[in-house]
Amino acid sequence: MPTFNQLVRKGRKVIEKKSNSPALQKGFNSKKKKPTDVNSPQKRGVCTVVKTSTPKKPNSALRKVARVRLTNGIEVSAYIPGIGHNLQEHSVVLIRGGRVKDLPGVRYHIVRGTLDTAGVAKRMQARSKYGAKRPKAGAASK
């Protein structure tokens, strides 16, 4: 507990909240070639590396991860959700915020079913999250 004099001298600091997805809060003005402070829900980027990585301690798997260079010039790691994907180097993808708890440094998800990213094949439930189209009426009875 500070004394009254200490508070007069220093004062209290207001704690500023850090963003969970800082790359989505920077834009880039290509005409002026300057970074801007523009928040956006998603950003477009180009895959530079598509690889698998292993999760933290209690879990074991090969998680699919892509390194993406965004339109604002920042390069981030993004998780590729769902079973199977068609991404490779130079694929254009859309990323959204959302970390993967057991992969350190992965703070973004790739949006399936947009741009060069195909939706998950044969996905029947939670289709909108994986970019899967609605199956035809005849194919539903399986």
UniProtKB/Swiss-Prot annotation:
Q: Note the InterPro entries from the entry.
A: NA-bd_OB-fold, Ribosomal_uS12, Ribosomal_uS12_bac
3-methylthioaspartic acid is found on: 102
* GO-annotated biological processes: translation
Span list, region Disordered: 1-43
Q: Which GO terms describe its cellular component?
A: small ribosomal subunit
What are the UniProt keywords, alphabetically? Methylation, Ribonucleoprotein, Ribosomal protein, RNA-binding, rRNA-binding, tRNA-binding
Q: Which GO terms describe its molecular function?
A: rRNA binding; structural constituent of ribosome; tRNA binding
Q: How does it assemble?
A: Part of the 30S ribosomal subunit. Contacts proteins S8 and S17. May interact with IF1 in the 30S initiation complex.
Recorded family membership: Belongs to the universal ribosomal protein uS12 family.
* Function recorded in the entry: With S4 and S5 plays an important role in translational accuracy. Interacts with and stabilizes bases of the 16S rRNA that are involved in tRNA selection in the A site and with the mRNA backbone. Located at the interface of the 30S and 50S subunits, it traverses the body of the 30S subunit contacting proteins on the other side and probably holding the rRNA structure together. The combined cluster of proteins S8, S12 and S17 appears to hold together the shoulder and platform of the 30S subunit.
This one is known as Small ribosomal subunit protein uS12
Query: What is the originating organism of this protein?
Result: Ruminiclostridium cellulolyticum (strain ATCC 35319 / DSM 5812 / JCM 6584 / H10)
| Name of encoding gene | rpsL
